[in-house]
Amino acid sequence: LTCLNCPEVYCRRFQKCRNGEKICFKKFDQRNLLGKRYEIGCAATCPEAKPREIVQCCSTDKCNR
């Protein structure tokens, strides 16, 4: 699996996921709309959203755009 992996909105850096990591995810805080920082990468399971966070998970190559 290959996922995007960088904190910017318009990410172009990809990462080959390690064994056991079968999920691509994108996570961000919905309160900070102007200076939005993303956490994007690979995971074994979909990360749990904290209050006011949005988490999106998928399982195909480069799907976490």
Swiss-Prot record:
Disulfide-bonded cysteine pairs: these are: C3-C24, C6-C11, C17-C42, C46-C57, C58-C63
Q: Give the domain of life.
A: Eukaryota
A GO MF annotation of the entry reads: toxin activity
Q: Name one GO cellular component term.
A: extracellular region
Keyword set, alphabetical order: Disulfide bond, Secreted, Toxin
According to UniProt, the tissues expressing it are described as: Expressed by the venom gland.
Q: Please describe what this protein does.
A: Binds with low affinity to muscular (alpha-1-beta-1-delta-epsilon/CHRNA1-CHRNB1-CHRND-CHRNE) and very low affinity to neuronal (alpha-7/CHRNA7) nicotinic acetylcholine receptor (nAChR).
Return the protein name.
Weak neurotoxin 8
Organism (species): Naja naja
* Biological classification of the source: Eukaryota, Metazoa, Chordata, Craniata, Vertebrata
